[in-house]
Amino acid sequence: MMEYKKLGNICNIVSGGTPSRSKSQYWDNGNIPWIKIRDIKSKYIEDSEEFITIEGLNNSSAKLLTKGTVLYTIFATLGEVGILKIDACANQAIAGLTVKDETKILPEYLYYYLKSKKNIVNKLGRGVAQNNINLSMLKEFEIEVIDIVKQNNIIKTLNYVDDIIKFKSLELKQLDELVKARFVELFGDPATNEYNWPMLNLENVSSIITYGLTVRPTYVNKGIDLISARELHKGFIEYEVAPKISFNDFQSLSDKGKPLKNDILFSKTGSIGHCALVDTDKMFAITQNAARLGLIIEKVNPVWLLYYLRMNYIQDWCKRHAKGNAVKDLQLKDIKAIPLFECPLELQNQFADFVKEVDKSRFIIKSMIKEGLL
């Protein structure tokens, strides 16, 4: 019989904090690592972008977490997990989980267990206004408790799988670099336009540039996918993790918020510039933080435009033109004004054919990674 225990019973759980930014003495020449979500990039966390002083630690809700503490993101980006290899503090978007008795639960087992439940936690978080879970909710989360020998066997197996995934992920990254290199070879870099292409704006090759619904319908367990900027950050549309709305609510929405095949979706709020191609005829809707680019395919190849928009110069252009303080937003008028090469459609198609061939290799590698995860 499987035994489950609540996280609050097997771990000491605390949230982080942020010293006042207005007090330089809390930050200048600090030597205490201060972890943010973007610092959780892999299994082990060994460094941070920012540091705070001992005065900043003592005059804020930040807490010093010891090496071996499991970090878990509880705000905005939910369910990211890492293990501290150093003593550090964290901000309030991160919870620190310190195992009370490591003879019963290994931190590394806890890491893998929590990582496997990310989709469940994301669904739980979407039930609240700001996509977050609080410490009370986290403490109630149940974990399967097995004996230490089995925990070690699971850790050993998953470490091996992790190594394979890292290697295959590197291969994927190399394929991405190959595609970028081919783009520059055929069209040049948008930063310099060394081929002297005439320039257009994005609106010149678009039939519609708009965004999705502004009032969120009620979520349901099964229904029509509702895609936001959050589901675009990997470069493709993550339908499987998107919240769902009812078919009746979907039908009541304006058609502008219902993308069509060969449209490009573009994150316009928060993490600006993530984009993905709609390569299916399935029905779904988008939120207001995702822009829909409906294209005139007689003027532009969607695959070519997708990679053009991902070029560093265009990404930087979009970030420079974004408005707002706490949360940046790229307004529709600025999206329409994105500068665009006017290059032959035949050459764009040639590039798209190259991408199609590379995608065959991508598919094989991703399938191998998926098998490893399963």
Kindly give the residue locations of the regions a language model identified:
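Non-catalytic DNA-recognition/assembly elements of restriction-modification systems
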Residues: 1-18, 42, 140-155, 167-211, ...
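Low-complexity, Lys/Gly-biased intrinsically disordered segments
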Residues: 2-42, 60, 195-237, 252-254
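Active-site/binding-pocket entry motifs
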Residues: 40-41, 77, 120, 208, ...
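A short glycine-rich beta-alpha junction/loop motif
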Residues: 74, 88-95, 114, 127-149, ...
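Short amphipathic alpha-helical signal-transduction/dimerization elements
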Residues: 114-122, 310-315, 359
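A specific heptad-register position in long alpha-helical coiled-coils used by two-component signaling proteins
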Residues: 159-162, 356
